[in-house]
């Protein structure tokens, strides 16, 4: 049985490896000259830094799925980050997150007294909800909608407080607004508004403490080389600079892909691209029309430095004076943030391979609106203000240390095919989560499947990998059912 995969992002790569292990003949088509999608490096003058994802979450899920795909633990190295990260507030206070719950309680007692009991209760409640959510949502596909609307699932949704926002749900645990920011900003990892995203996404901040934060040595994007080598060694046919233009259909099934103007036939097809765009390859009569809300975007600054800030944490957040105002500017008024929060990533503290000897790299991310009319080419002043904040609050002498600099904006992301320039797929709103999110079987076509950040269960590298795993299970199930009926998957 032949399977054609359109797109070489992480979802496409994991899908290809898993399907090949099951004995299928797999071809993968990638429009760019490299694989990996959002997992990529920016490299220049001997400096190398991750272009997109940097924080490795859910390490057990990541390693388990890689193992299922044939990637052994000795092919990559995960480094535990502890402290997890440090948050700096405009009033001069700070909050450091730790792996150790006991150390975290002490941190809260010392800096935000009165919130420690709430933290203990938060961790207890979230552990129960995490296990529920993992079992009922992360590990299940809802392409058959009936499997979602069960009494058990509805009870779980209520238990997960899906009807509340992340920010509002945290008011039951923390009196101090700064602590609530520290446990709600994680929705921005997947492009969601903490003031609006369902409370089930509070589980991200819980997971940081419970499962830890890790760094993949060499950079997160170094995983792509490992996966690509595995693809080639396993016999997957990989074609780069191969643009998939559309899906050719015959009745209720797909018959072929048009790739660089040529017809490529297969028995089943996988779409691995930002789904609002990828879905346009499917004829309208087979793909119900739908309006999507894009995730937030970001302005990214990459620096090559002539030094390493040895006392710096790997991850830091420099919070603005009004977090709620920043969120309003991103998600409602769609304007350039006036006093934004900034995430900084300085991996050279633990990885000397990213820059010339004695030098370092620095990455800064500012959440900004997607789908806005902002002319990012005219926002040099905004970039300079971000650099000023980094220098004043965390990296003294930064400007003098810069040897190389690069800036990426929502315009770059939109040019690369990301929906409205959003960085994380479609937004994790209530009605774009769970059963309401595009599923692994997203259309009326019985042999077309999908993987990626906009597909259930959502964004973030391990979660996209989990979505690919669910999608492969759907293909296997369909194939087995068809074999029992005595016909091939393509009829």
Curated annotation (Swiss-Prot):
GO terms for molecular function: oxidoreductase activity. InterPro entries: Amino_oxidase (IPR002937), Carotenoid/retinoid_OxRdtase (IPR014105), FAD/NAD-bd_sf (IPR036188). Keywords: Carotenoid biosynthesis, Oxidoreductase. Gene3D superfamilies: FAD/NAD(P)-binding domain (3.50.50.60). Pathway: Carotenoid biosynthesis. Its EC number is 1.2.99.10. It holds the Pfam family Amino_oxidase. It comes from the Bacteria. It catalyses: all-trans-4,4'-diapolycopen-4-al + A + H2O = all-trans-4,4'-diapolycopen-4-oate + AH2 + H(+). One of its GO terms (biological process) is carotenoid biosynthetic process. The keyword Nucleotidyltransferase does not apply. Transmembrane segments: none annotated. It is an enzyme of class 1 (oxidoreductase). The active site is at 208. NCBIfam families: crtI_fam. Belongs to the carotenoid/retinoid oxidoreductase family. CrtN subfamily. Involved in the biosynthesis of the major C30 carotenoid methyl 4'-[6-O-(acylglycosyl)oxy]-4,4'-diapolycopen-4-oic acid via 4,4'-diapolycopen-4-oic acid intermediate. Catalyzes the oxidation of 4,4'-diapolycopen-4-al to yield 4,4'-diapolycopen-4-oic acid. This is 4,4'-diapolycopen-4-al dehydrogenase. It comes from Metabacillus indicus (Bacillus indicus).
């Amino acid at each position: 049985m032949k399977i054609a995969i359109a797109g070489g992002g992480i979802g496409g790569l994991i899908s290809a490896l898993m399907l090949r292990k099951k004995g299928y003949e797999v071809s993968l088509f990638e429009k760019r000259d490299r694989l990996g999608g959002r997992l990529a490096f920016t490299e220049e003058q001997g400096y190398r830094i991750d272009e997109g994802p940097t924080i490795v979450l859910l390490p057990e899920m990541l390693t388990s799925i890689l193992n299922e795909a044939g990637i052994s633990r000795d092919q990559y190295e995960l480094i535990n980050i502890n402290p997890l990260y440090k948050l700096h507030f405009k009033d001069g206070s700070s909050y450091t997150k730790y792996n150790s719950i006991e150390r975290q309680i002490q941190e809260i007692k010392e800096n935000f007294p009165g919130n420690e009991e709430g933290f203990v209760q938060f961790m207890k409640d979230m552990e129960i909800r995490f296990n529920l959510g993992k079992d009922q949502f992360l590990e299940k596909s809802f392409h058959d909608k009936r499997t979602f609307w069960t009494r058990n699932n509805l009870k779980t949704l209520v238990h997960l407080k899906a009807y509340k926002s992340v920010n509002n749900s945290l008011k039951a645990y923390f009196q101090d607004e700064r602590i609530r920011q520290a446990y709600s900003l994680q929705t921005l990892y997947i492009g969601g508004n903490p003031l609006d995203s369902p409370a089930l996404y509070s589980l991200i901040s819980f997971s940081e403490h419970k499962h830890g934060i890790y760094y993949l040595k060499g950079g997160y994007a170094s995983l792509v080389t490992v996966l690509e080598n595995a693809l080639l060694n396993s016999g997957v046919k990989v074609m780069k600079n191969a643009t998939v233009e559309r899906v050719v259909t015959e009745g209720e099934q797909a018959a072929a892909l048009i790739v660089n103007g040529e017809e490529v036939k297969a028995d089943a097809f996988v779409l691995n691209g930002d789904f609002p765009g990828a879905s346009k390859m499917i004829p309208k009569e087979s793909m119900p029309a739908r309006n999507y809300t894009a995730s937030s975007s970001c302005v990214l600054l990459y620096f090559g430095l002539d030094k390493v800030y040895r006392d710096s944490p790997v991850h830091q957040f420099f919070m603005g004076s009004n977090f709620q105002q920043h969120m309003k500017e991103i998600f409602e008024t769609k304007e350039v943030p006036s006093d934004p929060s900034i995430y900084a990533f300085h991996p050279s503290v633990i990885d000397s391979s990213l820059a010339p000897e004695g030098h370092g790299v620095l990455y800064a991310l500012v959440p900004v609106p997607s789908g806005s009319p902002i002319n990012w080419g005219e926002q040099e002043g905004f970039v300079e203000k971000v650099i000023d904040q980094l220098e004043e609050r965390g990296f003294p002498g930064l400007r003098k240390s810069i040897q190389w600099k690069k800036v990426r904006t929502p315009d770059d992301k939109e040019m690369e095919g990301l929906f409205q320039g959003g960085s994380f797929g479609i937004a994790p709103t209530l009605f774009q989560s769970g059963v309401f999110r595009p599923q692994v079987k997203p259309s009326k076509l019985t042999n077309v499947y999908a993987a990626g950040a906009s597909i259930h269960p959502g964004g973030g590298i391990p979660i996209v990998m989990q979505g690919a795993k669910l999608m492969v299970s759907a293909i296997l199930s369909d194939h087995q059912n068809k074999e029992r009926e005595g016909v091939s998957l393509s009829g």
